[in-house]
Amino acid sequence: MAGGKIPIVGIVACLQPEMGIGFRGGLPWRLPSEMKYFRQVTSLTKDPNKKNALIMGRKTWESIPPKFRPLPNRMNVIISRSFKDDFVHDKERSIVQSNSLANAIMNLESNFKEHLERIYVIGGGEVYSQIFSITDHWLITKINPLDKNATPAMDTFLDAKKLEEVFSEQDPAQLKEFLPPKVELPETDCDQRYSLEEKGYCFEFTLYNRK
């Protein structure tokens, strides 16, 4: 990416088929293998001299238990209209506060391009809705309950129509190539998909690229 912009990647787990991403500000599931995937994908890089930035809204930041934040080995960028400044960097804690998504990305591009491999956007719903025009890729974990009668309630959704209009799902080989080599993927299933079953859910790791 020498001379180019830092790739922007949306990463999210979605309940199928409506692409539900949350309920009452949280998630109705706790899937350790999915959380491990998220941690590895966003922490690891192909270039050992670079790191990744995570952009999130204030509510997403506050939903992370205090003992786990900032998320380690990543630049944590929190955006909120309540912040006065365009960009405030706490270098010691690797935390940035910005008053808008546009200002956050502009400053990351201007000041950290040589040090960042990717910018991951991790939520919440309002932030996801703003990034379809600027995102290069989406990493979507597609989640299905094993018992269709036990489908959890959702009140926040990814815009599935916009996703399908602008992005196309890639095959599993392209997902593997896209990820840093140390990310641990499950064995592929009979359809050559990267899928797992855990705690009453089946979930599949997928990559979408801009058309």
Curated annotation (Swiss-Prot):
- Give the protein's function: Key enzyme in folate metabolism. Catalyzes an essential reaction for de novo glycine and purine synthesis, and for DNA precursor synthesis.
Q: Which UniProt keywords apply?
A: NADP, One-carbon metabolism, Oxidoreductase
Amino acids binding substrate: E34, M35, K36, Y37, F38, R39, R74
Q: Could you tell me which residue ranges the DHFR domain spans?
A: 7-210
The entry sums up its family as follows: Belongs to the dihydrofolate reductase family.
Reaction it catalyzes: (6S)-5,6,7,8-tetrahydrofolate + NADP(+) = 7,8-dihydrofolate + NADPH + H(+)
Q: Which organism is it from?
A: Saccharomyces cerevisiae (strain ATCC 204508 / S288c) (Baker's yeast)
Name of the gene this protein is made from: DFR1
Give the E.C. number(s): 1.5.1.3
Query: InterPro entries, alphabetically?
Result: DHFR, DHFR-like_dom_sf, DHFR_CS, DHFR_dom
Q: Which GO terms describe its biological process?
A: dihydrofolate metabolic process; folic acid metabolic process; one-carbon metabolic process; tetrahydrofolate biosynthetic process
The opening ranks of the lineage are: Eukaryota, Fungi, Dikarya, Ascomycota, Saccharomycotina
Miscellaneous field: Present with 1080 molecules/cell in log phase SD medium.
Which domain of life does the UniProt lineage start with?
A: Eukaryota
Which pathway, per its entry?
Cofactor biosynthesis; tetrahydrofolate biosynthesis; 5,6,7,8-tetrahydrofolate from 7,8-dihydrofolate: step 1/1
Recorded GO cellular component terms are: cytoplasm; mitochondrion
Which Pfam family, giving just one, matches this sequence?
A: DHFR_1
The terms under GO molecular function for this entry are:
dihydrofolate reductase activity; mRNA binding; NADP binding
Which SUPFAM superfamilies does this chain map to?
Dihydrofolate reductase-like
Question: Could you identify this protein by its name?
Answer: Dihydrofolate reductase
Residue sites binding NADP(+) per the record: 13, 20-26, 58-60, 80-82, 123-130
